[in-house]
From Swiss-Prot:
Function field: One of two assembly initiator proteins, it binds directly to the 5'-end of the 23S rRNA, where it nucleates assembly of the 50S subunit.
Protein name: Large ribosomal subunit protein uL24
Name of encoding gene: rplX
Family indicated by similarity: Belongs to the universal ribosomal protein uL24 family.
Listed Pfam families: KOW, ribosomal_L24
Domain of life: Bacteria
Disulfide linkage: none
Organism (species): Xylella fastidiosa (strain M12)
Keywords: Ribonucleoprotein, Ribosomal protein, RNA-binding, rRNA-binding
Molecular function GO labels: rRNA binding; structural constituent of ribosome
Length: 105
């Protein structure tokens, strides 16, 4: 099954405390994604000299549910739904539903 979102896609948050923020997908874990500069939380870390970790409070991105994001359409500057188009040779392409443009091309 082809994924509607992929690592490296530009997305916009459509729900939650970070609604309206934009970022790039860093990691996908099942139905949750980590987006750069979105859902920043503070983590308390212990110092670990063997790994070179100084410890203290560290700001990092926490995962958010995939239903709270939409892929960003660069032509419109808004969030858009993702559709699929199957070519004659059997290749499956992701397209923007509003414009029909191929994603990532």
């Amino acid at each position: 099954m082809a994924s509607r979102i992929k690592k490296g896609d530009q997305v916009i948050v459509i729900a939650g405390k970070d609604k309206g923020k934009q970022g790039e997908i860093i990691r996908i874990d099942g139905h949750r994604v980590v987006v750069s500069n979105v859902n920043i939380v503070k983590r308390h870390t212990k110092p670990n000299p063997q790994r070179g970790i100084s410890g203290g409070l560290i700001d990092r991105e926490a995962p958010i549910h995939v239903s709270n994001i939409q892929i960003l359409n660069p032509m419109t500057g808004k969030g858009d739904r993702v559709g699929f188009k199957i070519l004659d040779d059997g290749c499956k392409l992701r397209i923007f539903r509003s414009t029909g443009e191929v994603i990532g091309a």
